[in-house]
Curated annotation (Swiss-Prot):
Binding site for Fe cation: C92, H134, H138
Organism: Blochmanniella floridana
Protein family membership: Belongs to the polypeptide deformylase family.
Name the UniProt record assigns to this protein: Peptide deformylase
Lineage of origin: Bacteria, Pseudomonadati, Pseudomonadota, Gammaproteobacteria, Enterobacterales
One of the record's GO molecular function terms: metal ion binding
Amino acid sequence: MSILQMLYYPDQRLRKIARSVSIISHDTKKIISDMFETMYFQQGIGLAATQVDIHQKIIVIDLNNNIQKRLVFINPCIIKKIGTITHIIEGCLSIPKIRASVPRSQNIIVQSLDENGNNFEMEATDLLSVCIQHEIDHLLGKLFIDYLSPFKIQRIHKKINKWSTVYKNHIKLSH
């Protein structure tokens, strides 16, 4: 297993639409394993292949850092949104230090393949529902900030520019 290189906003590769996985091979399983390792290293609860510059429809989720409850979704598709819209504060490994309230369906039914190629459907609620929707958005080239107002996006850009300037200056000083 290895830790994969993350893509960070505003990298345009995050906007690339992922392609479906046609064959689940040994390479696919290695990607999944590496994605979990990367997600744990980054202290996340979900990761889409797009975030590590692999443009295949694969997401991994582990809400509780529990190897027995790890979830893999290959070619996931939300087939039904149920109930009310919820607003949960979201963050993203590809947009560090930024959090925002995003409208999401509280309950969904998702259809997918597992890591062995078996088709399954599951109902997801609350945080799991939000996480699946967030990660599927990545596969579609969308980011959670796309749901925000232009004013909020402008504020986020200012923060990112400030942090990248501080980071670049820190790198120069430490060399």
